[in-house]
């Protein structure tokens, strides 16, 4: 990692040094730079005929009475009564636009749903709510329970509550805590709605929530590892020196 950082530093120093020298070199003069211009584009006292390429009474190449190439009575190339090329009554084509489409409205429900996943839930002591998952396909060993699960899986949670993975020593502790708090919250919600959970429901819900907590742990562990790798990369001395040098070149 250190060798890679040093080679990156050498490459960027060489590249930016060459660009810096190119920027400081004076630009060579083009054809007829600084000399007399024809026709009539030199010093203020030069002979201007015809005046800048237009006809009689045409300061900038427009028709009769056209200061900047527009039609009759058009100061800057617009239609009748158009000062800067806009429509009728439009100064520059940017104001007074009729039938302007309204901006699309943001769907507040989508914003609320996106903010809910991964956010700290108030009143639960630092627990976060995970993203919605598809309920896993689980076989319980007999046809009755398998059929019961397929018919009632919608009654079981599809999101789990959890704490950050860095607060646990291993996966088992994370999953155990995740299962307990998720089942507790779902049971309270179900009871509040007036529904009852049977022993079969509790058994199946424990299996379902356990699988989802394992999946949540794998996701959080991977994200935590990636964040740690990024911090290690950007905290290495060669990368810090490289970033400082680039900032110096941009600002300077």
UniProtKB/Swiss-Prot annotation:
Keyword RNA-binding assigned: no
Sequence segments annotated as region (Disordered): 26-104
Zinc as UniProt keyword: yes
Entry's Gene Ontology molecular function annotations: copper ion binding
Prodomain positions: 230-252
Disulfide bonds: 178-213
Entry keyword set: Amyloid, Cell membrane, Copper, Disulfide bond, Glycoprotein, Golgi apparatus, GPI-anchor, Lipoprotein, Membrane, Metal-binding, Prion, Repeat, Signal, Zinc
Region span, Interaction with GRB2, ERI3 and SYN1: 23-229
Signal sequence extent: 1-22
Cellular component annotations (GO), alphabetically ordered: Golgi apparatus; plasma membrane; side of membrane
Lipidation (GPI-anchor amidated serine): 229
Positions with a binding annotation for Cu(2+) 1: 60-62
Chief localization: membrane
Binding locations of Cu(2+) 3: 76-78
Gene Ontology terms: biological process: protein homooligomerization
Topology in membrane: Lipid-anchor; GPI-anchor
Glycosylation sites per record: 180, 196
Positions of Cu(2+) 4 binding: 84-86
Biased composition (Gly residues): 52-92
Pathology noted in the entry: PrP is found in high quantity in the brain of humans and animals infected with the degenerative neurological diseases kuru, Creutzfeldt-Jakob disease (CJD), Gerstmann-Straussler syndrome (GSS), scrapie, bovine spongiform encephalopathy (BSE), transmissible mink encephalopathy (TME), etc.
Reported function: Its primary physiological function is unclear. Has cytoprotective activity against internal or environmental stresses. May play a role in neuronal development and synaptic plasticity. May be required for neuronal myelin sheath maintenance. May play a role in iron uptake and iron homeostasis. Soluble oligomers are toxic to cultured neuroblastoma cells and induce apoptosis (in vitro). Association with GPC1 (via its heparan sulfate chains) targets PRNP to lipid rafts. Also provides Cu(2+) or Zn(2+) for the ascorbate-mediated GPC1 deaminase degradation of its heparan sulfate side chains.
Subunit structure, as described in the record: Monomer and homodimer. Has a tendency to aggregate into amyloid fibrils containing a cross-beta spine, formed by a steric zipper of superposed beta-strands. Soluble oligomers may represent an intermediate stage on the path to fibril formation. Copper binding may promote oligomerization. Interacts with GRB2, APP, ERI3/PRNPIP and SYN1. Mislocalized cytosolically exposed PrP interacts with MGRN1; this interaction alters MGRN1 subcellular location and causes lysosomal enlargement. Interacts with KIAA1191.
PANTHER family xrefs: DOPPEL PRION, MAJOR PRION PROTEIN
Protein name: Major prion protein
